[in-house]
Amino acid sequence: MNVNNPNQMTVTPVYNGCDSGEGPQSVRGYFDAVAGENVKYDLTYLADTQGFTGVQCIYIDNAENDGAFEIDVEETGQRIKCPAGKQGYFPLLVPGRAKFVARHLGSGKKSVPLFFLNFTIAQGVW
C-alpha cells in the first residue's frame, strides 16, 4: 500500500469570505498510483503541527482519467466517487481526525489532483 507522506504536504491559506477557527485553508493532496492501489491520507499531522482542522470539502480533478476515483472517510465510512473525465467539489463528513483512503478504478498509473478544504463549497461536478 502506498502511504502519502504528510511531511511533503503544506497548508495554504485561502480566502472565501467566511471565518473558520484557523481561517480558510486548503491542503494539496498528491494521488499518484496504479489502478486499484490504496493511498492513505492522514491529515492529523497537519492538525497537530499547522492547525489544519475541520476538513469539510474536497476538490477532485479526475478530468484526465479513464476510470472513477474514490475516496473514503475512515471515521464515518462515507465514500465519494468522482466519475471518469469529471472534476468537482464534494462535501465531506469528517467529525474528528481527518483520515482518508483513496483509489483509482481506471487502467494503469494515474495522477489525480486533490485539495482538502476546511470550509464548505456547494457540491458541483462538471
From Swiss-Prot:
Record bears the keyword Cytoplasm: no
GO CC annotation: viral capsid
InterPro entries listed in its UniProt record: Phage_PRD1_P5_spike_N
Superkingdom of this protein's organism: Viruses
Keywords: Virion
Subcellular location: Virion
Function: In association with P2 and trimeric P5, forms the spike complexes located at the 5-fold vertices of the capsid. Essential for viral infectivity.
Protein name: Penton protein P31
UniProt source species: Enterobacteria phage PRD1 (Bacteriophage PRD1)
Lineage: Viruses, Varidnaviria, Bamfordvirae, Preplasmiviricota, Tectiliviricetes
